[in-house]
Amino acid sequence: NLILFVPVLSVSVYRTMDKIMLGWLSTYSSVGYYENIDKIINICLGFITALGQVMLPKSANLVARGKIEESNRLIVKSFKFSTLFCSALVFGLISISDVFVPVFFGTEFLPSIGILMLLAPNLFLLAWGNVLKTQFLMPRGKDMAYIISTLLGAVINTVVNVMLIPIFSGIGAAIGTICAEFISLIYILWVIKSDFDIMKFFASVRYIASGFIMMLGVVIVKQYVTVSLAGLFALIVTGAVIYAVECVILAYFKDDLLLEIMTIARKTIKHKLLRH
């Protein structure tokens, strides 16, 4: 079945295409700048795709048993969890990019900073697309919509790359990737809107707002740290503390997802303590 090859294709096609076209239309140094950031994004992407792989069997089972409403609730919960997780990653990467890149890659790779700041938000699009593909399209047999969304993204990416890479190099490739994932996501939302209340996804905006506030806090603290490993560590800790406090505040105001996460965490900790 062709659909079995699409998940593999959709994970790698855009950035693989980006690097190939960068080599054709720009310089080899621009490929290097892009390649380093691609590695970072791939690490983050691994956690995102893992969620889809874990939830696919459960979603398929619910649909097969006719429990559509329960399946829809699971999709909303997964969408919210992905947004909660990605908000920390996206705004964290953006806020520390100008420290992270010189510390890990060296000052000669400073052009990678702009690429990282552009590609980081793409994690939102990848995560949301992954949830909808693996928990809605695949379990409900909408294979063709899945394939079209991937091919549509590939076409958009190619067109934008041809237009922008000769002018903006790696930045142009990053813009092409974002455009591709955005159009692909919009197409999927259009496909599912008749069977699913997509307005429920807007409850996730609170996590994006929390991530943005965290980023502002890190940017303020960044004025007082050096471009060093210690400075980078201080920024990461600052961001983690701010985001954790925000999550506690949201839970206090009865955020259902965070209340569930905290309940599971308490039970897990209590169980482990009792075992010892």
What label would you give each PLM region?
Residues 1-15, 54, 58-73, 194-208, ...:
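Interhelical loop/hinge segments that connect adjacent transmembrane helices in multipass membrane
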Residues 5, 9-44, 61-62, 98-108, ...:
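Helix-terminus/linker motif at the lipid-water interface of multi-pass membrane proteins
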Residues 7, 11, 15, 38, ...:
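Short runs within selected transmembrane alpha-helices of multi-pass transporters and secretion channels
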Residues 11, 158-161, 213-227:
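Hydrophobic alpha-helical transmembrane segments in multi-pass integral membrane proteins
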Residues 28, 93-124:
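Interfacial segments at transmembrane-helix termini and the short loops linking adjacent helices
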Residues 29-32, 76, 110-113, 143-144, ...:
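Residues that define the loop-to-transmembrane-helix transition and helix capping
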